[in-house]
Amino acid sequence: MWLAAFVFALTLPVFYSCSGDDNGKTASANVNANNAQVFPEYARMEMPHIKDGSRIIIHRTDAFGVNYIVEWDDGLRAQRWTCYRLDPDNSVKKGSRSGWWHGKDPFAEDELIPAAYRTTLTDYSQMTPHYDRGHICPSADRLNSKEANQQTYLLGNIQPQLNGFNTGVWLYMENKIHGNSYDNIKGWNNTAFRDTLYICKGGTIDNNNYTRSNTGLVIPKYFFAAILRVKNGQYNALGLWFEHKNDHSTSLKAYACSIDELERRTGIDFFCNLPDDRERVIEAAQPNDALWGLE
């Protein structure tokens, strides 16, 4: 069961599920950093700059603290992004979807979002044509506990996706992050490659870059991922931009871009808690194809 504390700061409502200590570290002060005086989670490295008036949803577990964070737009009934991190502590594997759910449907409404603004299982089941319930923070990135895994199935972490996209290039991108031995994909989430991966993903819900389903769900025209790798004090970033269409590509090279370019396309200020001088260099750099294994 999730425990929620409803807190308001400025115009930003913040919602917590469960408890636990936050292991985020506040970066040096800079002009575009989030204000973390009241909510220290805002200073986490994976956090983008928060859009004024948005609802911030923080899901936590007792064992691992912050599981993931969502920016939710009440007016659109849609999430703008989910951000999370991968590190040696939260990357331990203690179970699997099949072992935990035994064929049952684990998807559920996100009760940290007020009923008037949340999406529902019926919104998805009555969609015509059909769209998948596409994870933003994937189930496979949260296998450290049943609680953490279950939270990835909350509809606040879900966007409608075409099946040929969800099971195609989006799945391939997910596998490149966490690895997939069955398909012989070596992922980035390993100690040889990273100390920590900071990840922000989502679909476009601004500037009319979306359509709507017959049930009123926002359907993004594009999806994106911003990934920051930290290893031995070295920082490298990768932006990924996907048109939302049936696409079974098994190469990410054509979708890769700098974080600056991804910010231009999405209107989102990624990794805003980095010191400004470091942020400018990291986000302007073009992706290192060899480092990321882009093919």
Q: What residue ranges belong to the model's regions?
A:
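Bacterial N-terminal signal peptides
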Residues: 4-13
